[in-house]
Amino acid sequence: MERKIGTRQIIFILSLFLIAQFIGLLLVIPSYSPSYSYANNAVPQQGGSVSFFFWFIIDIIIIILVLMLVLRYYKGNMFFRLLEAYIIIFGSFFFFMTLINDILPAIAIFPLSAISLFISLALLAYKIKFNKMRNLITLITSIGAGIFIGANIGIGFGFLTLYLLIGLFAVYDYLAVFVLKFMIPFAQEASKRNLAFMIGSTDLELSPSKSKKRMKKEDLEKIQNPEMRYIAERSGTPSISAIMLGNGDIMLPMTLAVGSYMISGNLFISMMIITGAGAGLLFTIFLLRKYKIGLPAIPPLFAFMSAFLSLAFLISKPRDPSLSILTGIVALVSLLVIFVTLRKIGKKKFEE
């Protein structure tokens, strides 16, 4: 059966993506007062954050190596469930901690942490028992993780370091899909197990009745549902309409938008980051529909965020021409790499 990305799936996934970005930004506005500027926070100001950043990078490298080994040699289910449990507890803890602090700003840290942990564990227990609400849980954990990383790296190191980190993730995503080739199998395993690592939408689309595309008799006989078979006989060829978006694809734009606001207090810059991310997601979907292969989402998102940042730094006050030029160059280089790679893939598929 043919697979494609339908209009309803595009609207659904784009809506969830943008809702997550705006919720993440709205949650930090009451809780954090910006205390740094782009200029005075270009280098680390807090010694504790240096240790956090170092171990954060080490953790990422270890996770990548473990994932590669697991996908190659491990055929069980326990590892994926443990990884899901860790992500749910980690992300949802900071989500509920920020949310409760917004509602009850006078609450002490101990009851705040205890309540947040209890809700996180309850959410995990629900997911384990019923294995439902994947999209909602993924959004909650992505928002929480985005706020946590944006706060620690953004405030501790400044905008340029945070921007560089997102760029490194874009490079990693590119390598994981096109070079190391373990990200697509990992996404497939996560989808098959319904793990809270991604949001997605899947539906059955049918061609219009005037379509010339018709299913063969032997294919029609394979459809066990009599109602669906009746519709397929009169409406043309059914196709699976599906799209998936990983939690990292949701978290990283939010990390940059949230961190940028917490550093400078410039809401316009954060809004431009989110707008660029939305445009990047639409561009990614366009590429998916055109090339019909699994693609990394973070590189296009990063390219369009950089392009919109370049414009933002030119028109915002105070203006920053140097950052505008830097992000503009990064956007052009990123898009060039994407187009060259896809052109090679398209040429290879044509030759085959």
Tell where the protein language model's regions lie, with residue ranges.
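A membrane-topology feature that recognizes alpha-helical transmembrane segments
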Residues: M1-E352
